[in-house]
Swiss-Prot record:
GO cellular component: fungal-type vacuole; mating projection tip; plasma membrane
Compositional bias (Low complexity): 126-175
Residue list for modification Phosphoserine: S260, S327, S329, S355
Membrane topology: Single-pass type I membrane protein
Name of the featured protein: Cell wall integrity sensor MID2
Pfam families, alphabetized: Mid2 (PF04478)
Mod. after translation: O-mannosylated by PMT2.
GO biological process: fungal-type cell wall organization; IRE1-mediated unfolded protein response; pexophagy; positive regulation of cell integrity MAPK cascade; response to acidic pH; response to osmotic stress
Segments on the Cytoplasmic side according to the record's topology features: 246-376
Family: Belongs to the MID2 like cell wall stress sensor family.
Signal peptide: 1-25
Function, in words: Cell wall stress sensor. Involved in activation of a response that includes both stress-related increased chitin synthesis and the MPK1 mitogen-activated protein kinase cell integrity pathway. High-copy activator of the SKN7 transcription factor. Required during induction of MPK1 tyrosine phosphorylation under a variety of stress conditions. Required for PKC pathway activation under low pH conditions. Required for cell integrity signaling during pheromone-induced morphogenesis. Activates ROM1 or ROM2 catalyzed guanine nucleotide exchange toward RHO1 in cell wall integrity signaling.
Glycan-modified residues: N35, N211
Length: 376
């Protein structure tokens, strides 16, 4: 009877512990209500705990019926029944702790630690219960020790499952790395990129047009001033330079001569431009003067008269010679007449020819040829 009461008290203690675990699970569910996934997993854990408690109660009922039947049996069979009942109760406890710890590991790291502490309390309570049952009989103590040795093997699997929260920290680290933004500038374009998107910023067309519209040159007023200075100073300067070039290089130098009649004759010398051009072509350049009208021509010999007028002048001069001849024949001196009618060789000459030689002025060209209005 003592063992029966001990078993009942042990079962009541297990019920109390299961209730406490459910209350703790509900408390942790309320604390993690911000996370929807944690709430759902916590609710599933609560439902599993309730199902495990119902299984535990049914096992207790079955164990009580087994105990009642064992009282009618012998002592050896009674110890055997107690051994099996204790092993089943320990197995149910280990199963309960396993299911609860596996559910709590998915909720959060804090709930996993609290659930692992609750599972440890279950193992302690089971250990104390088995120690009490070992005092009843030696065979039950050996069975309980064997069950205790089997309990850590079953509880070792929750320890491996509870180490899962250490891997749950990696999403936060990857989220931090994925949230980082990389900024780069390529060919004048700014590129912002992270794990999800890539944004490219290019200079706007309005900015380019505004920069092009801005001119860095002179203003309109200054430009007009510059144009006025160039036109007002540059154009007269160019005209002066052209005039100097014409006067000293292109214009031919001229010289005025006076002939025997007192007329002015103009002679021209080759200009510098012509000299340079002849030198370039390899021609001989002379500094002699050249006149438009030849020296001793009709204009100079006849006093600016043409050929017909010169003929009239010559006829008048011949008449003048005849008059002189008549006056010479009146003189009684024959020697003078003979002297006038003979030349240096003693030949008789015409007096008109002699008078023409005195009146007529002769002109010669550069080659020594005599120039006259008729043979020119």
């Amino acid at each position: 009877m003592l063992s029966f009461t001990t078993k009942n008290s042990f079962r009541l203690l297990l019920l109390i512990l299961s209730c406490i675990s459910t209350i703790r699970a509900q408390f942790f569910v309320q604390s993690s209500s911000s996370n929807s996934s944690a709430v759902s997993t916590a609710r599933s854990s609560v439902s599993r705990v309730s199902s495990s408690s119902s299984i535990l109660s049914s096992s207790m009922v079955s164990s009580s019926s087994a105990d009642s039947s064992s009282l009618t049996s012998s002592t050896s069979s009674r110890s055997l029944v107690s051994h099996t009942s204790s092993s089943t109760s320990i197995a149910s406890i280990s199963f309960t702790s396993f299911s609860f710890s596996s559910d709590s590991s998915t909720s959060s790291s804090s709930s996993a630690s609290s659930d692992s502490s609750s599972s440890s309390s279950f193992s302690i309570s089971s250990t104390s219960a088995t120690s009490e049952s070992s005092t009843s009989s030696t065979q039950t103590s050996t069975s309980s020790s064997s069950s205790l040795s089997s309990t850590p093997s079953s509880s070792s699997s929750p320890s491996t499952i509870t180490s899962a929260p250490s891997t749950s920290s990696t999403p936060s680290t990857t989220a931090y790395n994925q949230g980082s933004t990389i900024t780069s500038i390529i060919n004048g374009k700014t590129i912002l990129s992270n794990h999800y998107t890539t944004v490219t910023y290019t200079p706007s067309a309005t900015a380019d047009s505004s920069n092009k519209s801005k001119s860095s040159g002179l203003s309109k007023k200054n430009r007009n001033i510059v144009i006025g200075c160039v036109v007002g100073i540059g154009v007269p300067l160019i005209l002066v330079i052209l005039a100097l070039i014409y006067m000293f290089c292109i214009q031919s130098s001229r010289t005025d001569f006076i002939d025997s009649d007192g007329k002015v004759v103009t002679a021209y010398r080759a200009n510098k431009f012509t000299k340079w051009w002849y030198m370039l072509l390899g021609k001989k350049v002379s500094d002699e003067y050249h006149s438009d009208s030849p020296l001793g021509g009709s204009a100079s010999s006849a006093g600016g008269l043409d050929l017909d007028e010169a003929d009239d002048v010559m006829e008048q001069s011949s008449l003048f010679d005849v008059r002189i001849r008549d006056s010479d024949s009146v003189l009684p001196n024959a020697n003078t007449a003979d002297h006038n009618n003979t030349n240096s060789g003693g030949e008789p000459i015409n007096s008109s020819v002699a008078s023409n030689d005195i009146i007529e002025e002769k002109f010669y060209d550069e080659q020594g040829n005599e120039l006259s209005p008729r043979n020119y």
